[in-house]
A protein has these predicted regions:
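Basic, polar low-complexity surface loops/patches
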Residues: 2-127
Length: 127
């Protein structure tokens, strides 16, 4: 049976507690230590990844949308990637996904080369 409701929208109260302007800085800061997980945060019909997670998501989904953003209170531009809820649903049918909350899911990946991330990040900021 097809579920038309996005995965992260099952409990809208939870979704709003994870991805808020107050939390953006914490989420971006946590990415600095991230080497093997893609942290995705629901916005309803889309899932967003920041910085290192965004880099790894772009490798997994080469056609994902890439965005640059300035986050209030964070001194540097941030690179984000975004995929549609239905793309994530398709992926999760064949892969193990952790879901700490309905609005946050974690995909396990291989460790990446930090110099590859730095080059990708620079290119995205200068695009």
């Amino acid at each position: 049976m097809r579920n038309p409701q996005p995965m992260g929208a099952r409990n809208p109260r939870v979704a709003k507690t994870e991805l808020t302007p107050d939390n953006y800085r914490n989420l971006v800061e946590a990415e600095r230590k991230n080497e093997r997980h893609i942290n995705l945060y629901s916005t309803g019909y889309f899932w967003i990844a920041f910085e290192q997670s965004a880099f790894m998501l772009s490798k997994l989904f080469p056609k994902c949308a890439v965005l640059r953003a300035n986050i209030p209170g964070y001194p540097f531009p941030v690179v984000m990637t975004m995929i549609k809820d239905n793309e994530l649903r398709s992926y999760t049918r064949e892969h193990i996904v952790k879901k700490p909350t309905p609005s946050h899911c974690i995909l396990l990946t291989n460790a990446y080369d930090r110099s590859d991330f730095a080059l990708w990040h620079r290119r995205q900021l200068n695009a």
